[in-house]
């Protein structure tokens, strides 16, 4: 049940104030649980603070002094069922160590899904040894090793950063449409693999923002055997007073949309997104590499927003 995966039951909530992340992280399974819950919490934060679902589609949880809203299965709100199914599909790919990046994309024209208005990137790495991941100390990344308390603090900081940004963004268009693209590590992912709720995607070589895009790094968390990095790209005009609270990328926004086998140089292997320009991946780059496997939801989601 997705409800159990995303938010547990109400009795657990009463038993502890810190119900989201496990109290100890000592092995690969517990590390996976942390990353799953962090991913689900971030998606819940985004959908709640961007006003995509009603209050009734969320459950209350606490993480230290943070009051969080966690998306739940709400039969009265079919959209919540769509998103939870997407999250479950990501969980399946994470368990198998196939998932490289999940990209939650918001656009307005169903005939032009490449013309985006907001993007949320979740990039995943794996290690068998459980060693500490290295993150850029000059950015708003949060280092964490295998110490359980450090991991919880890192998760809390990342979620807090995301909350700060969401609360300082201007509103989305009323007719926004949601989809999620999943990118894989080609070397280990079977050619015919598709997570539940997903199908093979048509590979797009470009994305387009109608306005000027700005890319913001929310941070990174390592849980020992897994790590997750979060980046948000939105229109610059949508930024209110949170510009100095998060780390911005200078110049042209780069989205890792193709060529996702480049583990260490994320920005170098993405397709650029520029103001009113379709920027294609260089043919010489793509022709020298195996075609990238990408999945998309069987059904996209159109929120009933007014």
UniProtKB/Swiss-Prot annotation:
Q: Offer a single GO CC term for the protein.
A: cytosol
Under the heading InterPro entries, the entry gives:
HORMA_dom, HORMA_dom_sf, HORMA_MeioticProgression
Task: Let me know which tissues express this protein, per UniProt.
Answer: Specifically expressed in meiotic germ cells.
At what positions is Phosphoserine found? 271
Q: What happens when the gene is disrupted?
A: Male mice are infertile due to spermatocyte loss as a result of characteristic impairment of sex body formation. Spermatocyte apoptosis is confined to the stage IV seminiferous tubules. In contrast to males, female mice are fertile.
Its annotated compartments are: Nucleus; Chromosome
UniProt-listed GO biological process terms: meiotic cell cycle; meiotic sister chromatid cohesion
The answer to whether UniProt assigns keyword Phosphoprotein to this entry is yes
What does the record say about PTM? Phosphorylated in a SPO11-dependent manner.
Please provide the record's keywords in A-Z order: Chromosome, Meiosis, Nucleus, Phosphoprotein
Q: Does the keyword rRNA-binding apply?
A: no
- Which residue range or ranges hold the HORMA domain? 29-232
Which PANTHER family does the entry mention? HORMA DOMAIN-CONTAINING PROTEIN 1, HORMA DOMAIN-CONTAINING PROTEIN 2
State its role.
Essential for synapsis surveillance during meiotic prophase via the recruitment of ATR activity. Plays a key role in the male mid-pachytene checkpoint and the female meiotic prophase checkpoint: required for efficient build-up of ATR activity on unsynapsed chromosome regions, a process believed to form the basis of meiotic silencing of unsynapsed chromatin (MSUC) and meiotic prophase quality control in both sexes. Required for the DNA double-strand break-independent, BRCA1-dependent activation of ATR on the sex chromosomes that is essential for normal sex body formation.
User: Self-association or partners: how does it assemble?
Assistant: Interacts with HORMAD1.
* Name of this protein: HORMA domain-containing protein 2
Annotated source species:
Mus musculus (Mouse)
């Amino acid at each position: 049940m997705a409800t159990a995966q995303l938010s547990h039951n109400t009795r657990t909530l009463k038993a502890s104030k810190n119900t989201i992340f496990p109290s100890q992280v000592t092995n690969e399974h517990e590390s996976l649980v942390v990353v799953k819950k962090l991913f689900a919490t971030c998606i819940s934060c985004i959908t709640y603070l961007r006003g995509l679902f009603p209050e009734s589609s969320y459950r209350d949880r606490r993480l230290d002094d943070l009051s969080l809203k966690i998306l739940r299965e709400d039969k009265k709100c079919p959209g919540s069922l769509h998103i939870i199914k997407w999250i479950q599909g990501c969980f399946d790919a994470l368990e198998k160590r196939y998932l490289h990046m999940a990209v939650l994309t918001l656009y307005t024209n169903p005939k032009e899904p490449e013309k985006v208005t907001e993007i949320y990137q979740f990039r995943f790495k794996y290690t068998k040894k459980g060693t500490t991941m290295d993150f850029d100390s000059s950015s708003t990344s949060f280092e964490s090793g295998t110490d359980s308390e450090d991991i919880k603090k890192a998760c809390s900081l990342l979620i807090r950063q995301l909350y700060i940004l969401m609360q300082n963004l201007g509103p989305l268009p009323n007719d926004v449409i949601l989809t999620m693209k999943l990118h894989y590590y080609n070397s280990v992912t079977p050619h015919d693999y598709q997570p539940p709720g997903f199908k093979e995607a048509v590979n797009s070589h470009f994305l387009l923002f109608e306005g000027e895009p700005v890319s913001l790094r929310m941070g990174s968390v390592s849980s020992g055997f897994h790590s997750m990095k979060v980046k948000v790209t939105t229109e610059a005009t949508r930024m209110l007073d949170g510009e100095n609270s998060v780390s911005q990328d200078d110049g042209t926004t780069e989205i890792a949309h193709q060529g996702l086998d480049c583990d260490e140089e994320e920005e170098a292997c993405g397709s650029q997104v520029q103001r009113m320009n379709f920027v294609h991946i260089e043919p010489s780059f793509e022709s020298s590499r195996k075609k990238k496997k990408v999945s998309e939801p069987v059904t996209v989601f159109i929120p009933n927003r007014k």
